[in-house]
């Protein structure tokens, strides 16, 4: 006899059903502690490969490994109860073949217990998305600016801002939707294009630097908390935690050096004899 939790976690079909409804709220998290905070207010938590930048100081997401994603995905699952947890498939874990993608995605789901995976690419990845979804793996797509392709893009620049540049991105959105993805992240595209894609495809769009018309929004948690020194244009800072954290560390260092910490209230005395 198994013991089932009475708390119901959101699923990929729940997010899919939100098309055209209340906006979907999503943030990134890589730790159990932040996941528990994000979980209170968000519909979905993205364990993004942006952890390579945020946690490890990489310049791009390319060096991130499958093992890194699984480790942090498991942490986020332990820290959350309600939100759908989506784990990024890192560069090199799914592009070679749809079979490679299945084995990587299956590992992520089995070892983290998350509810879905996310992968980058539109038309070129449609066959893989279909292969995964037909085999029981919920997939969130990612089009527009695709950071894992930085070495071919050359820079992290917004997409679809020139005349005649919309068609490939629109084709990507359509391909991802028709392949069976339950939603798609639309990153750093011209606002009118983000709006048009949202109006055109049947699955929810989750914007990041796209349009307020998208079916939902996502940001990197550390960016919106003010912990990133140079966040992208599309980030709104809802907090300024950086200076506060620095002040706390400075205060701690000063008190340790002056022997003001630990004080009497922070140490243990001897037990009195009975």
From Swiss-Prot:
Q: Which Gene Ontology cellular component terms are annotated? A: cytoplasm
According to UniProt, this protein's pathway is:
Cofactor biosynthesis; (R)-pantothenate biosynthesis; (R)-pantoate from 3-methyl-2-oxobutanoate: step 1/2
UniProt-listed Enzyme Commission number(s): 2.1.2.11
Give the matching Pfam families: Pantoate_transf
- Which GO molecular-function terms appear in the entry? 3-methyl-2-oxobutanoate hydroxymethyltransferase activity; magnesium ion binding
Q: Which cofactor does it need?
A: Mg(2+)
Tell me which residues bind 3-methyl-2-oxobutanoate: 49-50, 88, 118
List GO BP terms, alphabetically: pantothenate biosynthetic process
Give the primary localization class: cytoplasm
| Co-factor binding details | Binds 1 Mg(2+) ion per subunit.
Q: Which domain of life is it from?
A: Bacteria
Description of how the protein assembles with itself and partners: Homodecamer; pentamer of dimers.
Briefly, what is this protein's role? Catalyzes the reversible reaction in which hydroxymethyl group from 5,10-methylenetetrahydrofolate is transferred onto alpha-ketoisovalerate to form ketopantoate.
Under what name is this protein listed? 3-methyl-2-oxobutanoate hydroxymethyltransferase
- Native source organism of the sequence: Rhodopseudomonas palustris (strain TIE-1)
